[in-house]
Amino acid sequence: MELQELAKTLTMAPVSFLEFSLALLCLAVLYYLHVRSRRKNPLIPLDWPVVGMLPALLVNLPRLHDWVTSLLSTTQLNFRLTGPPLSGRHLFFTSDPANVRHVFTSNFPNYPKGTELAEIMDILGGGIFNADGDSWRRQRAKAQLLMSGPRFRAFVSRCSRLKVERDLLPLLDHVAATSTGGVCDLKDVFLRLTFDMTATLVFGVDPGCLTVSFQEVRFARAIDDAMDVLLVRSVLPLSWWKLVRWLGVGYERKMTVARLDIDGFIGDAIAKRRDAVKAGRVIEDDDEDSADLLSSYIDEDDDAVDDVILRDTTMNLMLAGRDTTGSALSWFFYLLTMNPRVESKILAELDTIKATTSTTLDDMVTYDPDELGRLVYLHAALCESLRLYPPVPFEHKGVVAAEALPSGHQVRPGDKIVVSLYAMGRMEAVWGEDCREFRPERWIGEDGKLRYVPSYKFASFNTGPRTCLGKDMAFVQLKVVAAAVVRNFEVEAVPGHVVEPNISIILHMKNGFKARIKRRRQVMNS
């Protein structure tokens, strides 16, 4: 009899579980319909009892940038996204210039980077990006002293022009002459170019990433892998990815391998530079003294700075220069292919300055960086591209003490403030009704000179005390590359190839940028 009762219970259990599950589902549907009917704005995600707004975030993750833009557009530039109660993921999104000015400048000490971000970005060590307080101030003062000096500025100009003339133009000329119809991935080309340029400026070494063979460089591959892992970490709760790291599996295993390659390359560069400085040897590059930042740090402090500090410093500088400039160039040329009117104006402006014709590159030309610095429309076009496609689409800040922001929203310790620069460039309240148009003229005043735009409105180079130290260097590189490519080649987007932002820490293109390259045949100034 007992066996029969037990059998009866077991056969009924699945039915009871099914009924229970259906009841839960019905309750969830009723809750959804009830909350939805009371929402004033249907675009705002539902805040579920246990998971918060996490389901909406996960569903919209593939189009995160445009989703956040639509939310901020419909919520007057500010929106609070709540995560699961114990996740620590309570994010306050903003694209309000007044809030940006307050957080990044007016009350700067109350909004540090925070220890959690430093843990996520541990590949950067104690470098300037992770540092707060006195450590950050010391590092910034030292970097500013070296990067603002005339010797380094001249080094940037010379290396940028030489790299374009020796490697970029010949490679594009080779692509244009190939049987594949002159098609290449310009995103890949520009990332390789800026990797070599940045490594030269930071380490005094050209890794040779930009070659006709498109060979893989382990150091470059390692940085790409590390960036992929950092994105995963930034989305997951701290305890989750730390457990995966402790287990040494999955993406964290990839980070371990990447760190070994990164530390190996940088360690070798540091050792060689120390030996050269101690031996009193002149580091030469085209018979001129090299002014790379690593040599300058070692020469300034000799043995006072240890290898760990040098490793962290150079890694931060490398990351700052390589991906951001490569991303900016990719989006700039994509926008030019969509707006031939702008390209024509840039070509006309280039005709007003002197070009240098190469005797070894089939009459292709390059430009002196100082001459390019006088061009207004080229600078405006680059700013307009950076407005629409900022290389760093999000800026993150922690909160020390509770207070009300200029928008009236309250923030508390534990909150994460996320500034969407991508969304800010698409806000009518900030840039007007034509905010989504690529229109360089918005940067030019009636007097024909560049119009002043406050950095808290155009924050592609950050704003406040943390304003990017490499801003001038970046514009030199962008202009040297843009002018040479526009003048010597016609760039056409391959029809049917979809270009859209990737979900990454740097605003890369999801599918790359397939473009057809053709030599431009016409009379040019010389």
PLM-predicted stretches and their roles:
Residues E2-L27, T82-F92, R151-L162, D173-T200, ...:
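Cytochrome P450
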Residues E2-R138, C159-R166, A258-D261:
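N-terminal membrane-proximal hinge/A-helix region immediately C-terminal to the signal-anchor transmembrane segment
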Residues L54-F79, G264, D268, D363-S407:
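Conserved cytochrome P450 K-helix E-x-x-R motif and the immediately C-terminal K′/meander segment
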Residues L145-L146, A320, W443-L478, S504:
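Cytochrome P450 heme-thiolate "Cys pocket" and heme-binding signature region
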Residues S148-F152, M227-D228, V232, T256-L329, ...:
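Conserved cytochrome P450 catalytic core segment spanning the I/J/K helices
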Residues T194, T198, F203, A258, ...:
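Central I-helix of cytochrome P450 enzymes
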Residues P340-V342, I417, K471-H508, G512:
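Cytochrome P450 heme-binding "Cys pocket" and the immediately downstream C-terminal segment
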Residues Y389, V419-K449:
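Conserved cytochrome P450 K-helix/beta-meander segment immediately N-terminal to the heme-binding cysteine loop
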